Amino acid sequence: RAAENILCHAYIRKGSLIPMNYHFTTTMAHITQYGGKVAELLYDEGFNVDSDYPFKGNMHIEKLEETIKTHGAENIPFIRVEASTNLIGGQPFSIQNLREVRAIADKYNIRVVLDASLLGENAYLIHLREEEFKDYSLGEIIKAMTDLADIVYFSARKLSSSRGGGICTNNHEIYRELEPLIPLYEGFLTYGGISVREIEAMAVGLYETLDETMIRQSPDFIAYLVNALDAHGVPMVKPAGVLGAHVNAMEICRHIPQNEYPAGALAAALFLISGIRGMERGTLSNQRDEDGNETLADMELVRLAVPRRVFTLSQIKYVVDRMAWLYENRELIGGLRFVYEPPVLRFFMGGLEPVSDWPQKLMAKFKADFGESL
């Protein structure tokens, strides 16, 4: 978030437009805070949860050029590409697509910014799915990706292993533009508000990102979880992405209107019957519009995150068992409403309550089936 704030402060002004494959919550908040707007330019496959298209995070090249022509290159300070696109199910882009984005950017003299927070996992899926790179190491793939960007920024908690983040560039002009903002907002250039201990841990974590044995553990477990839940009929985002298995709450909770937050309700129901914490990625994660109306999400997902080197396979199987039961009893799930709604990033700190007594009915059915087991 600190990196996003620095970049937005440096480049975004009122009227700026940032084309991207898809937004992330804090990215959108920072851009709008500085007066900019976002243009999301996925191909249709990116929103089709049942499509087996391998690179749903690809940016729509024709729409990108059309957007630049319509709004003017002078109003577009950079094009943002997110690795392992988070909010559509951790879906990767291909290097070929990034090359095409780079070519358009060069044509109109616009910079390319790569959100590399989930770079290692995107590289691993390129290794598996993009024929040209099947014999490349993760390090070679990551270099090919970063060579196509002017600026690379990341959350170390996602890419590496520690608190903090970073902004990288091999362009001295860009470095000089960003340089004075670091001590203003974070700390001196040599540490940026991060302790030396955390920087050392970050360096180790970045090297580990090049280790296929380490980086593949999470995607492999996620693929197992997606396939196992799919075998039970649970609607999932396919093909399996990274970061977590993503459950299609729009389909499971079709009886819940989007303004009652079906993904949030499904996550709450899962926690009640299992203690499993899923993350809502849908309308609840969006900001209201300028008139106070809900901004309905393109997708309603519950992310079942699978961190690296944390879970055993038996724990993944427990998730399958409880999620499968909940799917069979999905009609018992009801909606949610806010009792406290912060004006920004409401899903972090807001408070909600059920719109009816559906939690009691759900738990009564669970106890009838399982006894007092939780």
Predicted segments with their positions:
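Conserved glycine-rich beta-strand-loop-beta hairpin in the small C-terminal domain of fold type I
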Residues: 221-223, 237-249
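PLP-dependent enzyme catalytic core of the Aspartate aminotransferase-like
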Residues: 273, 285-374
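Short, solvent-exposed beta-strand edge segments and adjacent coil->beta transition regions
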Residues: 164, 242, 299-303
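Conserved PLP-enzyme active-site core in the AAT-like
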Residues: 1-236, 257
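Short, conserved charged micro-motifs
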Residues: 176, 254-262, 309-318
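Flexible glycine/proline-rich, aromatic-decorated loop/lid segments
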Residues: 40, 171-177, 197, 272-299
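Active-site loop ensemble at the mouth of alpha/beta enzyme cores that anchors a bound cofactor
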Residues: 222, 249-277, 291-297
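Acidic carboxylate-rich catalytic motifs and surrounding loops in phosphoryl-/glycosyl-chemistry enzymes
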Residues: 156, 240, 281-284
